[in-house]
Amino acid sequence: MALWGGRFTQAADQRFKQFNDSLRFDYRLAEQDIVGSVAWSKALVTVGVLTAEEQAQLEEALNVLLEDVRARPQQILESDAEDIHSWVEGKLIDKVGQLGKKLHTGRSRNDQVATDLKLWCKDTVSELLTANRQLQSALVETAQNNQDAVMPGYTHLQRAQPVTFAHWCLAYVEMLARDESRLQDALKRLDVSPLGCGALAGTAYEIDREQLAGWLGFASATRNSLDSVSDRDHVLELLSAAAIGMVHLSRFAEDLIFFNTGEAGFVELSDRVTSGSSLMPQKKNPDALELIRGKCGRVQGALTGMMMTLKGLPLAYNKDMQEDKEGLFDALDTWLDCLHMAALVLDGIQVKRPRCQEAAQQGYANATELADYLVAKGVPFREAHHIVGEAVVEAIRQGKPLEDLPLSELQKFSQVIGEDVYPILSLQSCLEKRAAKGGVSPQQVAQAIAFAQARLE
């Protein structure tokens, strides 16, 4: 039976019912709805709506229902209830009879669903934070094991300067740390309870909403009933965090897809995260990474869709707001799955050090070192930049790396160049000179690993 049927003389058209009902997706709020109902029953005792004995009977029935839902959640979808609130109330009435009809006193589905969704978001943020930190730890461990793996760093997908695989890993640790911070920051604004705000104007019962918030594990209660039932900022914030986080994971995936190509050959992915071709027996495709990259778009779409849903809504609750859940559920599920999958990819990755080093020695990635050498000899940087550009052109013409050009050739471009230039052009020198904070020098990378390990403990 609908929770609102008394006003109507005709039954809802079945087509409208199918269009209107939300149980097929808000069933995921079942546990939160039951937990919120237990807390509400306690609040009703404080204002004399329920006796202590009635409340105990309701709480016992709700706890039995909670265990039943955890054991067999699929039972919810076997119902034709309008939404999860109707389903829980119907099951409660089945268990305790008329007493179950007293529970909704002073409560609206508007503050009820807002509370349920916030509780679900809090639970899910906790899962996301755990998965995020697990991936950070996997990256730090991979970095620690590959501090000596020299590889080319890229700009414009052109070899630019030597870096290490460890330094590359730590770049993504920084991105994930910002994702973690965004989630923690969003959690602060999320951690306020709307329960007790009624449909929009507040409840007519003098319930201690701060006490009620505490029972539910919220830091405090909201301050304005009209805003409380209308607010979906937390949905937008979490979708935004997910969208940014998925961009980071997509870039991570794209890098590794490139590193795994036959043309680059820097890494070998585990058989556990790759697949083959139905036609070409030799293929080993990076499907896990491609799916991470591909799933980024659906999360961006969820954020955009929710922005458009909310932008024109008047206060307070409107049925449009039912659209907040499917996109949110899908986006956060996707982000969580991709965090886990990225960690699994790292678990079996093999870095091909000889190939990485060979690539780092190609493409004149040490050209900047020669320019810095000239600057140290008193040549203005802009002039040094031009000199080195000419030297690179000559090296390309001869098919040699810069360090293989004889001194007489190098001195054609600048007389200040001496024998001491050759150690400067080595890969090790290129790395060691980047010793400022955040640089790629072995010392800085080791410090960054130690800092990340300490932060993640």
Swiss-Prot record:
Catalytic reactions of this protein: 2-(N(omega)-L-arginino)succinate = fumarate + L-arginine
Pathway recorded for this protein: Amino-acid biosynthesis; L-arginine biosynthesis; L-arginine from L-ornithine and carbamoyl phosphate: step 3/3
Enzyme class: lyase
Keywords in alphabetical order: Amino-acid biosynthesis, Arginine biosynthesis, Cytoplasm, Lyase
Pfam families named among the record's database cross-references: ASL_C2 (PF14698), Lyase_1 (PF00206)
Localization per Swiss-Prot or TrEMBL: Cytoplasm
Record GO cellular component, one term: cytosol
The EC number(s) this enzyme carries: 4.3.2.1
Superkingdom of this protein's organism: Bacteria
A GO term for molecular function: argininosuccinate lyase activity
Biological-process GO terms, alphabetical: arginine biosynthetic process via ornithine; L-arginine biosynthetic process
Family recorded in the similarity comment: Belongs to the lyase 1 family. Argininosuccinate lyase subfamily.
Matching HAMAP family: Arg_succ_lyase (MF_00006)
Protein name: Argininosuccinate lyase
Taxonomic source organism: Shigella flexneri
The encoding gene: argH
